[in-house]
């Protein structure tokens, strides 16, 4: 019920970020992007939208809101002078991520990769470990590979798990080699483990480059 009402409200008020701030907490509020518990199966489209087209339209609404606000907006006073409302880009991207999760649309997931750096790190780690596991395009592969060097340990760990199940190209392994210059010991160990999966000739080339 909450989602249905908030969905209808977003149809009308998506051009008003201050109103979206009050809509968003109820919008798709039954979804949890968590690596733990029983949340990895993913939401069903039919539980939240009438059609795929409607879901994509709402994704575009959310993207418009994202582009119209700063990292965090504060609306105060809000309705009453003692109240305030907040809207962050991370909040918006999380709802966009839910839509890409339920649609299984590779092109939409490609599009979201440009916005994922704004997402709060715990949720970003969950998205990589659940929705981008495995990646379904080269762009998604590159995003996961880039995340192997993220500041967040959670994000790095999930990226490593995804990459461990992939066969990396020589070009991708070159990018993994670059991570060995960073000081984080866990990041370096992950990079070495990935490089050790290469065929013997490519591994020898990696060792030669790293020693020169």
Label each region the model flagged.
Residues 6-10, 56-63, 71-81, 105-116, ...:
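Amphipathic alpha-helical scaffolding segments comprising HEAT/armadillo-like alpha-solenoid repeats
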Residues 1-66:
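Non-catalytic protein-protein interaction scaffold segments in large eukaryotic complex-forming proteins
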Residues 1, 11, 29, 44-47, ...:
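Structural detector for internal amphipathic alpha-helices that build alpha-solenoid repeat scaffolds
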């Amino acid at each position: 019920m909450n989602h249905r009402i908030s969905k209808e409200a977003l149809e009308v008020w998506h051009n008003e970020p201050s109103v979206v701030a009050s809509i968003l907490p109820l919008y798709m509020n039954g979804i949890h992007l968590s690596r733990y518990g029983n949340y990895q199966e993913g939401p069903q489209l039919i539980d939240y939208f009438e059609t795929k087209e409607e879901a994509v339209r709402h994704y575009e609404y959310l993207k418009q809101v994202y582009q119209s606000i700063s990292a965090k907006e504060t609306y105060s006073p809000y309705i009453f002078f003692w109240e305030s409302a907040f809207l962050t880009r991370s909040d918006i991207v999380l709802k966009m991520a839910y839509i890409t999760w339920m649609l299984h649309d590779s092109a939409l997931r490609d599009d979201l990769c440009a916005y994922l750096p704004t997402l709060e790190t715990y949720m970003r780690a969950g998205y990589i470990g659940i929705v981008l596991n495995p990646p379904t395009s080269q762009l998604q592969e590159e995003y996961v590979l880039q995340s192997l060097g993220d500041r967040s340990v959670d994000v790095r760990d999930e990226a490593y798990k995804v990459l461990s199940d992939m066969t990396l190209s020589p070009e991708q392994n070159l990018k993994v080699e670059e991570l060995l210059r960073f000081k984080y010991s866990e990041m370096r160990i992950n990079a070495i483990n990935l490089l050790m999966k290469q065929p013997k000739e490519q591994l020898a080339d990696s060792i030669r480059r790293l020693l020169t």
